[in-house]
Amino acid sequence: MKNLQESYTESELKDLAGKGIFGSKGSDGYLLIKTNFGEGEKVIAYADLNNDKYTDIITYKQEKNSIYFYSYTYDHNQYIFNKSEVLFILNSTLDNPIVKNVIVNSFIKTSISPDFLISISNDDKNKYETHLFYKNKNKDEYLYKNLNINSNIVVADINGDRNMEIIFFKDNMRQIFYFGDEYSKDGTIKSFDEILSSKDKEGASNYKFLNKKFSDKYGNAFVDLNGDCLPDLILTSEEDQILYLEIYYHTEEKYNLDSYSFKIGEYGAFLIGDFDRNSQLDILFPHLNEPKVTIFYNQFQSNHNWDENYCEIIKNNNDVKEKKYKKVFNEFFLNDSKTYKTIDLIKNNSQNYTFYGKETLIRAGDFGSTGIPGLLAIFKTNETNNKNKIIKLFEFEKDKITEVDLKLDTYLEKMDIQYATFFDFAEDGRLDLIIQGKDKIISIWNNNSPDKFFIKNKIVLKKGKFSTLEFGTSFRYVVTDNEGLRSDNVVAQMPQTSGMIIPLPFAYQGIGRSNNYIEHLYAISTSFDKVSNDIISVNKDSFTPIIPNTQLIITKGYEKEKVKWEIELVVTPTENLLILLIVIIIILFIILFIIIFLHSKERNEDKEQDSDNFRAWFA
């Protein structure tokens, strides 16, 4: 088998994507694998449509306005994605429609499979349509509903009641659309300010947030930022060349507002991750005009006593100290190296590189399993010998950042790269790459650092015969590394909320080269209390110890409104498992031989002793 480090002819390179698998397990590095994505298709979402616990890939072909899905199967060491027939056709009244956002989750209670919420805009992004596709028990085909939402959207389970809410902008105000427990054909709409506390409703009005469009260019999210185990809502908005970062902290009853503002021309869409490995989520912004990123470090006090009740400890500490929820990031531009750090990604000739596009073209993922998310970025280059877009990987480890050479530049230069994202093709806990060209998709298998360990988790909500990813959940682990240092790490499970982000459909945490047991793994989610009707309760479970290279799948169901967790552990063996088993068997045989030898020797000595005693008796 060839890989891209070896030579290919021009015709072979041209036809490389689309069939079978390339690369051998004996090769280290990043290898191109052939996949059967159709020409002109684009990856738009991940989902488990057939409820087999594997992740399927959703694609869209604009030429035919068709949505397809590729179901994952494993057959004789081959990882195959079987293409479906057309799931449904998109019909839009817009000129030159562009699919902006695809969210596969549960919106209608009577659906018998995951629903598709699709946001479409035109080239100028001044017109939007929002389409919902769903199945009910009467028909096995997708039904269509136009939600009459003509703005960009953000989706989250804001109330924690297992019903997805859609935040949108209409009539110069922010509104929330949802279907609720009792399915209404037209849904229900309420004002965005209803989720805010009285004080913060006033604060949001003063900032004019409530009548300001939120942006899909700079990112939105639904994650726990302040460590109290309740997911917080992050929105971005822009006005007069100022970018506003709005953070709505989730208390047990309402949301409290915190906001920051800075010049809009400096940054692109933000990323979230634990970039300093202190069990708190930080925010990273790429610079638009230079190959740099700035990480704003979470300023909440980390809890390093590894107590099972750390959520309550953090919440109580902040309540006692300030009688309110402390600001996470203090001020964005304090002259304090502990608050933020700007990192040069490209050291040499950096003036020739800029990030490609403002939106979603940089990704975070721990592809090196170091315990800190790395970066996948697309750059435009002004070098005379290469004016195309190029892809680079950057790995964080402790206090340094390293560029990882894909060794695929010769091939990738021939593509008109549109975007790139992470995926786990082989379900083996390695973050592979999907690279979207203008007319085709290529896939790159990560066979780097096989001696590093990971844990891969997800919480899904059981809805009848299918399940969907839960919003606002997080995972936290505690581990001791090979140097004897104890550390903790947090990662958020972030299903798609807005924009063409295509986030990972699971929470992935690298462990590095520590092959010790994971001492504690905490899985955290929230539930709606039907009795009080508006109180969020925290569901938290601790697993100890956990073997590295494990996938934890938690299926969260409800019986009589009580939460029921079903746990599945899938252990991914290391590449050297066979050798390890052979060595163990050989050692066991050696031990068995020694035991038999010693036992035989002892029996012979006993016989000789008995013979001597017998002769002595008669003598």
Regions found by a protein language model. Name each.
Residues Y68, Q78-D157, R162-I167:
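A generic tandem-repeat structural signature
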Residues K61, Y72, S119-S121, K135, ...:
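Short, structured coil/turn linkers that connect adjacent secondary-structure elements
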Residues A45-N51, V102-S111, V154-G160, A221-G227, ...:
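Structural signature of eukaryotic scaffold interfaces centered on beta-propeller domains
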Residues M1-Y30, N65-F88, K127-L143, M173-K199, ...:
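Beta-propeller blade repeat segments, especially FG-GAP/WD-type strand-to-loop junctions
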Residues K212-E252, F262-E397, K414, Q418:
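Beta-propeller domains
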Residues L32-I44, F88-V104, Y144-V154, K199-A221, ...:
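Repeat-based blade/solenoid architectures
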Residues N51-K61, K109-S119, G160-F169, G227-T236, ...:
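Acidic/hydrophobic-patterned starts of short beta strands in beta-sheet-rich repeat architectures
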Residues K2, S11-K14, K19, Y255, ...:
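Gly/Ser/Thr/Pro-enriched helix-cap/hinge segments flanking short amphipathic alpha-helices
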